[in-house]
Amino acid sequence: MPEEKNTFYITTPIYYPSGKAHIGHAYTTVAGDAMARYKRLKGYDVFYLTGTDEHGQKIQAKAKERGISEQEYVDEIAEGFQELWKKLEISNTDFIRTTQDRHKTSVEKIFEQLLEQGDIYLGEYEGWYSVSDEEYFTETQLEEVYKDENGKVIGGKAPSGNEVELVKEESYFFRMSKYADRLVEYYNSHPEFILPESRKNEMINNFIKPGLEDLAVSRTTFDWGIKVPGNPKHVVYVWIDALSNYITALGYNTDNDTKFQKYWPADVQIVGKEIVRFHTIYWPIMLMALDLPLPKMVFGHGWILMKDGKMSKSKGNVVDPYMLIDRYGLDALRYYLLREVPFGSDGLFTPEDFVDRVNYDLANDLGNLLNRTVAMINKYFDGEIPAYQGNVTEFDQTLVDFKNNVVKEYEGSMDHMQFSVALNQLWSLISRTNKYIDETAPWALAKEEDKRTELASVMTHLAENLRIIAVLLQPFLTRTPGEIFLQLGLQEENLKKWDSIYGYGEIPEGTTVVKKGTPIFPRLDAEVEVTYIQDEMKGSAPAPAEETAEVEALETPQIGIEDFDKIDLRVAEVKQVDKVKKADKLLCFQLDLGEGKLRQVLSGIAEFYQPEELIGKKVIVVSNLKPVKLRGLMSEGMILSGEKDGKLSVIEANSALPNGAKVK
């Protein structure tokens, strides 16, 4: 049932404007937008924040290269981000820029407070600094070191692969170690603070247990930043400057802090996995020092990768979101981003997968359902939707029950930010509705005059399911739901609201559909469009490169018998199973391993099981296999099966074992 109205504050990271906004930025921001739209539909007062982090040495260097001022440079790049958000129809409430006076003033007050209460002190720092990462590293943290003939370290590379230089300077430090125990206690008492669960374990084992060192929070080697109050040769470093945006945008530390009082703490902060550490260690410790409540959740999502690894102009694999929107439409890109990759995991972008999603999911499954429904209502009832009657055909109640179950599952998935799972559940309703047409055979009913009541019932159930599907699509797609409402002739706003999905038979008798609906997603010529996208991606390279064999970036490791003890076997509960298109032997599983998110695993058992047979079973999974791509889908593990006479049977675990239990 609909929830009581409340506030909901969601943020993306503020993006560093050192280059053009790309599909990775779009992915994060579209995900946040889907959540913001979902909560608004459910009646929440939503504040959705995004923005740009505009200070630092890299910005200063980029502006110098261009021969323009730092402010001119960031103005230009920030405008590009806002243009992309407009093109993606992002419904953000605010766009914070760290060069804005509202941010600067609040940051100065935050720094002064931390200094006065002794959480910040003045000292001297020497370490290996990466300009690109804007981070210091100890010698032991370097991925690679360069030594002179005497063995002295003279340089190296950060874990990111970026070059480092030795920097020694006076710096203000934040007493991180003072809050380490308190932070771990908070993790333990708030299990959903860091999601997925694996990110929390990484923070504790890799950063907190080895011991938190005090953090340098000012710089003197560049001056493009907020000056430290009372000591202007220092600029406030990124940790306090950038991370504070989530509260400065709400008016924290100002005379008008109404928004801060209303919306803080944030309900969810979405970040890429590479900056989880900053948002789950530095940021909460800073808030503890300020005596402010911590965000309720920090969700670290994975990366969108290419077959040859990360996007790079030199590799010719950069995906331009503007190109995809202009050629295929906004909703095609928004759908692909959140359907293709389980949120929280890494995933691959391929032109083939993108075109397949448009053709199979959007054009065939959804588009054809709408086209057939509108055409039949015009043909059999002169374009008017008949009055609703329940349980007329033997298939009606089954369809309604299926809808009710999907709505429940969909809301559960959305509340846990499992966007791909929610869309998968929604598409199961689309598939079930298409199957309902085959079951009821309206073309046969139309031939018998005494079956007129049954035929009318089929039309109303199809129209009603499409209406509900359109409502459920609204968090993800910004234009398609309106087109579905338009073609069904639905003008009343109450038919488009979230509360309307809990009932059935809401469409008024006599509602007139359009005479001939335009296909909402025209089918693409797969060969032509795949080639087009590939050529556009290659066009991003500065010069032609030699042809190389196409290698998958993620390969399944070879494990010998002597390494068997390295295999991590876990109990997993099957939550969702789907057939894989164009692959007769594969099933796609969504598994709960107790990680705080579902894991996608593909298994070649489709000829031995129907998908619905497997839902709810406890299976055993090899959980530490490197992800591999099968038929365009990522598989993050392997389900164990036994074989007899050529038939595979899934090995089931005791149902009493908890999800994620280790098998020994």
Curated annotation (Swiss-Prot):
Q: Where is this motif: 'HIGH' region?
A: 15-25
Fetch the SUPFAM superfamilies from UniProt. Anticodon-binding domain of a subclass of class I aminoacyl-tRNA synthetases, Nucleic acid-binding proteins, Nucleotidylyl transferase
> What InterPro entries does this protein's entry cite?
Anticodon_Met (IPR041872), Met-tRNA-synth_bsu_C (IPR004495), Met-tRNA_synth (IPR014758), Met-tRNA_synth_2 (IPR023457), Methionyl/Leucyl_tRNA_Synth (IPR015413), MetRS_core (IPR033911), NA-bd_OB-fold (IPR012340), Rossmann-like_a/b/a_fold (IPR014729)
Q: What is its EC number?
A: 6.1.1.10
Which of UniProt's keywords are assigned here?
A: Aminoacyl-tRNA synthetase, ATP-binding, Cytoplasm, Ligase, Nucleotide-binding, Protein biosynthesis, RNA-binding, tRNA-binding
Question: Where's the motif 'KMSKS' region?
Answer: 310-314
* Example GO biological process: methionyl-tRNA aminoacylation
Top-level EC class: ligase
Gene Ontology MF terms: ATP binding; methionine-tRNA ligase activity; tRNA binding
Q: Where does ATP bind?
A: K313
Localized where?
Cytoplasm
Matches recorded under Pfam families: Anticodon_3, tRNA-synt_1g, tRNA_bind
Q: What stretches pass through the bilayer?
A: none
Q: Which residues form the tRNA-binding domain?
A: 563-664
GO CC terms on record? Answer: cytoplasm
The signal peptide stretch is none
Question: What does the record note on quaternary structure?
Answer: Homodimer.
Q: Which family does the entry's similarity section mention?
A: Belongs to the class-I aminoacyl-tRNA synthetase family. MetG type 2B subfamily.
Q: What functional role does this protein have?
A: Is required not only for elongation of protein synthesis but also for the initiation of all mRNA translation through initiator tRNA(fMet) aminoacylation.
Stated name of the protein: Methionine--tRNA ligase
Lineage runs: Bacteria, Bacillati, Bacillota, Bacilli, Bacillales
